[in-house]
Amino acid sequence: MKEPKNLPKTSSGQLGDFLAQVKKTPSRIQRESVGRLVFGMDATASREKTWDNACQIQSKMFRATDDIGAINVQLCYYRGFNEFQCSGWSSSGEELIKEMTNVSCLGGHTQIAKIFKHALEEHRTQKIRALVFVGDALEENADELCYLAGKFGVFNIPIFMFQEGNSNAVMSTFKQVALLSGGAYAPFNSGSVKELQDLLSSVAVFVAGGHKALEKFEKSDRGREILTLQLRK
């Protein structure tokens, strides 16, 4: 799949809207000492160019929660012909990065519903606090994804949808999924990886410590506070 030309960078307004949505998301911090986050990714051929960036993003997510408490992350990805893989739960960014570097992208159809269904099964075993999905395409039934997203909403598990590229059809469904689950949506491309890292770090902090931790995180240094103020304009 060829990469679309002239992809728009993520705008300040869009990033600000995303952070505002995160702040509105109900916090599920209860007695669990460690928040659990399912991190789903599209590993089909079209995402090969940006896969390496995902490793850096994972590392930053873990560092962002150092002062709050650990998070446990499970990596799930699909690729090729009906291949769907999940890692074990890990609180080590290095372990997940090592696993991700051993993954090569392969052409195939999207399997987003499998990630959603798997996350719901994990939740039935032990509560998860959020699901993150990063992808650029949608080749399955949008109504089914929205139905599953509604289940996440019932269980109060927000889905944070990150879209690479500018497909309007993908954007429409990703936004609906985020809305139905009580989560949030944000687009990105190769020119806005830094912003994506910051947003995913914010999600990780939210999972680890809730709204108060997120607010403190955004004000933890002047550079981050300035960025946040710019995003909310």
Mark where each language-model region is:
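Acidic, polar low-complexity linker/tail segments
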Residues: 1-38, 45-52, 67-69
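Von Willebrand factor
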Residues: 32-88, 92-134, 138-143, 165-175
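DG-centered beta-turn motif at the end of beta-strands
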Residues: 39-44, 128-140, 163-165, 182
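Catalytic-core regions built around general acid/base machinery
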Residues: 61-64, 147-155
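Short, surface-exposed connector motifs at secondary-structure boundaries
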Residues: 129-130, 154-160
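Short, structured coil segments at secondary-structure junctions
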Residues: 155, 173, 180-181
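C-terminal "exit" segments of structured domains
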Residues: 181, 185-233
